[in-house]
């Protein structure tokens, strides 16, 4: 090989390297997406990776909260071991719920002590379910007063609500403008 013919492959490699660096972002590797997938995979394997606080909620972080409804004397929603759901004025072990995102803006409510999910049937009645199903999904909406409303995902227009005596109200008889559908997540 002569000297000029040896320079041709070097020039081609150099040109290819410059072209790869100048590619549009859509053709380059997306480290953010790959980091999120790695984090999701590590969580399913029981490992915990460090992530930023902002992305944790989007990645399926479970929040343990008590949902407080400021109606009547004020009640915390509780899930009892027999599947009944009602409100109790004072905090107790059955009022601790685990809120888990299942889709964007949709959560499931799980009674930590009772081991049951909050669910709503077609008539708007709340009940405790041992197994997760479509009736256990609720759309979480942040209201202007900084309270949350929980609308059934399967039955739109039906909301979780507590009456002034602490008993649940049927979801089809309430609207998000009524204070008995407003819940404040408390730690």
UniProtKB/Swiss-Prot annotation:
Induction: By derriere.
Signal peptide positions (record): 1-22
InterPro entries the UniProt entry points to: Fibroblast_GF_fam (IPR002209), IL1/FGF (IPR008996)
A GO CC annotation given for this chain: cytoplasm
Pfam family, one: FGF
Keywords for the protein's UniProt record, in alphabetical order: Developmental protein, Differentiation, Growth factor, Mitogen, Secreted, Signal
Matches recorded under SMART domains: FGF
Keyword Secreted attributed: yes
Subcellular localization, as worded in the UniProt entry: Secreted
Highest taxon above the source species: Eukaryota
GO terms of biological process kind: fibroblast growth factor receptor signaling pathway; neurogenesis; positive regulation of cell division; positive regulation of cell population proliferation; positive regulation of MAPK cascade; regulation of cell migration; zygote elongation
General function of this protein: Plays an important role in the regulation of embryonic development, cell proliferation, and cell differentiation. Good candidate for an inducing factor with possible roles both in mesoderm induction at the blastula stage and in the formation of the anteroposterior axis at the gastrula stage.
Family stated for the protein in its record: Belongs to the heparin-binding growth factors family.
Protein name as it appears in the record: Fibroblast growth factor 4A
């Amino acid at each position: 090989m002569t000297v000029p013919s040896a320079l041709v492959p070097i020039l081609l490699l150099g040109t290819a390297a410059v072209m790869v660096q100048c590619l549009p972002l859509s053709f380059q590797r997306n480290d953010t997406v790959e980091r999120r997938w790695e984090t999701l995979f590590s969580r399913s394997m029981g490992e915990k990776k460090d992530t930023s606080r902002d992305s944790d909620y989007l990645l399926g972080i479970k929040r343990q909260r008590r949902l407080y409804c400021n109606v009547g004397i004020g009640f915390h929603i509780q899930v009892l071991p027999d599947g009944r759901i009602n409100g109790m004025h004072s905090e107790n072990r059955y009022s601790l719920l685990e809120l888990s995102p299942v889709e964007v803006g949709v959560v499931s409510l799980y009674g930590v002590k009772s081991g049951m999910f909050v669910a709503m049937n077609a008539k708007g009645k709340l009940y405790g379910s041992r197994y997760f199903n479509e009736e256990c999904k609720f759309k979480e909406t942040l209201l202007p007063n900084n309270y949350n409303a929980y609308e059934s995902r399967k039955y739109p227009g039906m909301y979780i609500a507590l009456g002034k005596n602490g008993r649940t109200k049927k979801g089809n008889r309430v609207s998000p403008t009524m204070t008995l559908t407003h819940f404040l997540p408390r730690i």
